[in-house]
Amino acid sequence: MLEILQIPVLEDNYVYLLHEPGSGATAAVDPAVAGPVLEALDARGWRLGHVLNTHHHGDHVGGNLELKAATGCTVVGAAGDRHRIPGIDVALKDGEEFRLGSASARMLDVPGHTSGHVAFWFEDDAALFCGDTLFALGCGRLFEGSAEQMWRSLERLRALPAETKVFCAHEYTQANARFAVTIEPGNAALRERVERVEALRREGAATVPSILSEELATNPFLRPESPEIRARLGLPGVPEVEVFAEIRRRKDVFRG
């Protein structure tokens, strides 16, 4: 069973340290900066063997080269993004396996936020590291991909086991919650979740990870089939991707 350490960095990023105790193998997911990662490793006596990158944005790869210089770690990323991942050593294709001691992950292509975005799914640990594709109560902006690409990616993620823990890369949940209730205000589970999110943030506590079942019940970006959402958007009878695209468009201009 993986030990997972969540490290808050920058304004709202999370870096994750994954430690497989049987072998001592350790990986860092999306290290925006190196310093806090090195401090956490030193405090626990862990040795970094790998960096896993979900995409090429600077707040996800900014610590790659410093970590590589300090630890000799191997950088793992998507084959399609090898030209944009600093220090990449191992370029995986969709569905290929990454092993961390006795733990294993499948790399999943999930384009939309960027064209080369991927996620790492540790099935036996019910843990998904999805970068900026799926957020708690939200999803990533479409910087390079289309709404169709992002929707296919989200469909892929929402088909994972409901008990999957969703480790996204940012603490955006409070802002996402304020938008979500404008899209589906009649969702009682959403309203209850918003109250919990607000309480956690008042205490300075993290709202990440979430559970996929919770996202399926409350995240509007995963719920384009909802009759209430369709009615509020004036989009009855259209394909789910069109509903998703309209939700994303509204989120892009939301100020709340």
Curated annotation (Swiss-Prot):
Entry binding sites for Zn(2+) 1: H55, H57, H113, D132
CDD domains: hydroxyacylglutathione_hydrolase_MBL-fold
Cofactor binding mode and count: Binds 2 Zn(2+) ions per subunit.
Annotated positions binding Zn(2+) 2: D59, H60, D132, H170
GO BP terms, alphabetized: antibiotic catabolic process; methylglyoxal catabolic process to D-lactate via S-lactoyl-glutathione
Pathway per the UniProt entry: Secondary metabolite metabolism; methylglyoxal degradation; (R)-lactate from methylglyoxal: step 2/2
Listed SMART domains: Lactamase_B
Keyword annotations from UniProtKB, A to Z: Hydrolase, Metal-binding, Zinc
Reactions listed under catalytic activity: an S-(2-hydroxyacyl)glutathione + H2O = a 2-hydroxy carboxylate + glutathione + H(+)
GO molecular function, one term: zinc ion binding
Superkingdom as given in the UniProt entry: Bacteria
Needed co-factor(s): Zn(2+)
InterPro entries: Beta-lactamase_class-B_CS, Clx_II_MBL, Glyoxalase_II_hydrolase, HAGH_C, Hydroxyacylglutathione_Hdrlase, Metallo-B-lactamas, RibonucZ/Hydroxyglut_hydro
Catalytic activity, EC: 3.1.2.6
Family membership noted in the UniProt record: Belongs to the metallo-beta-lactamase superfamily. Glyoxalase II family.
Function: Thiolesterase that catalyzes the hydrolysis of S-D-lactoyl-glutathione to form glutathione and D-lactic acid.
HAMAP family reported for this sequence: Glyoxalase_2 (MF_01374)
Subunit relationships: Monomer.
Protein name per the record: Hydroxyacylglutathione hydrolase
